[in-house]
A protein has these predicted regions:
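Predominantly soluble domains enriched in secretory-pathway, periplasmic, or organellar proteins
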Residues: 2-375
Length: 375
């Protein structure tokens, strides 16, 4: 009788363990993810020229794909089951089919490309070649270059306005932004901005653009209707990222130089609130309802949640070493953080009153950028 009771106890414990495991798995599975749908993250690894594909339900790597030397600029095509990226050393764009985790195209784009953007409908990709001072437009269906254009010296990124009517290119060595026709890449104007312009944020109504300076404490405000520079705003430290509120009303700018977050009113073009966050805030991700901004602190090794509406800083969340790029999954269930120095992807349960780290998923060597795809 005693042996039978022990067996029953073992069976009961195993059953409870399996039940608990199932509950945890269900808890981590996003509510919108129906059977047959997949949710994956793709992380480019700069030191080994690969991309790590990570299943966000299993929270485990499922493939390592060779893409070429110095991968950068990884983006999810909004209209196709594809991840696009660049080989800066190879001078080409690569296309990854997410259903097979195989590279299906390599498209020459010019020397030293760093960033890639899509048209609003996902039909075209735009790449600026920093080493050739050129811009190309790629038809995403045929995967062929369909237009060439000239940029200024050492262009960084080509960004399309939300209305699809202009292509903006930041030219670092010229301290200008080029305006091009997004179909033909014919020139439409050149506007002077602050030194070494890099990142670009554009208001939802396509009326203004904001550009970071890579070497000063300024951001430039450009009127896209009149095509003139409105102002160069001093922030107190070099801007590291541009996060635009969905309604376009505010711009959030992490700055390692100020150890904090600068808020800019995009209607008045004035620097507003400042929040002290940590050692070296760099990148950020904003929830869809614009209530919480998650800011990565590279030197501190954590993520700082900010209740942005009330300007309240919450307790930091420890992740891996050198957290930088961060992005929320569709639905906002998880925040993914690329840990550049510990070679992993931090997964944070973001939709709780107190967000917490779930796990660290291994990546390749020296990960940099991140893309998320639901398919």
């Amino acid at each position: 009788m005693k042996i039978r009771l022990n067996y029953r106890l073992v069976i009961l414990l195993v059953f409870l363990a399996l039940l608990a495991f199932r509950e945890v798995a269900l808890e981590l599975r996003p509510s919108f993810l129906r059977p047959g749908l997949h949710l994956c993250a793709y992380v480019d690894n700069t030191a080994d020229g690969t991309v790590t594909a990570i299943d966000l339900v299993k929270l485990a790597p499922v493939a390592t794909i060779s893409v070429g030397a110095d991968p950068t600029g990884i983006r999810a095509n909004p209209a196709r089951k594809e991840i696009w990226g660049l080989s800066s050393a190879g001078g080409y764009a690569w296309v990854l089919d997410v259903t097979t985790n195989r590279i299906v195209a390599r498209i020459p784009v010019g020397a030293a490309p760093y960033a890639l953007d899509f048209s609003p409908d996902g039909s075209r990709a735009y790449v600026a070649a920093s080493g050739a001072n050129t811009v190309v437009a790629i038809d995403c269906a045929s995967r062929r270059v369909v237009a060439h254009g000239r940029a200024g010296r050492r262009p960084w990124i080509a960004r399309v306005t939300p209305d699809g009517k202009l292509l903006l290119v930041s030219n670092r060595d010229d301290a200008t932004v080029s305006l091009l026709d997004p179909v033909t890449l014919a020139p439409r104007g050149v506007i002077p901005v602050a030194p070494d312009p890099e990142q670009i944020a554009i208001l939802p109504d396509s009326s203004k653009a904001f550009l970071t300076s890579g070497t000063t404490d300024q951001i430039s405000v450009v009127d896209l209707t009149r095509r003139v520079l409105l102002a160069n705003l001093a922030l107190g430290g070099t801007p590291d990222d541009l996060i635009l509120k969905p309604d376009g009303g505010e711009l959030y700018i992490p700055s390692a130089g100020t150890h904090g977050l600068v808020v800019v009113d995009t209607q008045t073009d004035e620097v507003g609130d400042f929040l002290l966050l940590g050692s070296s805030p760099s990148d950020a991700a904003l929830t869809a309802d614009a209530q919480v901004l998650f800011v990565s602190d590279f030197a501190g090794g954590h993520i700082v949640p900010v209740a942005i509406g009330v300007r309240q800083v919450a307790k930091p969340i420890s992740v891996g070493q050198g957290p930088q790029t961060c992005e929320l999954t569709p639905g906002g269930d998880m925040l993914l953080v690329v840990d550049t120095q510990s070679d992993d992807l931090g997964v944070i349960r973001a939709n709780e009153p107190t967000p917490s780290l779930v796990t660290l998923v291994p990546t390749g060597s020296h990960p940099r950028d991140l893309a998320i795809k639901l398919f």
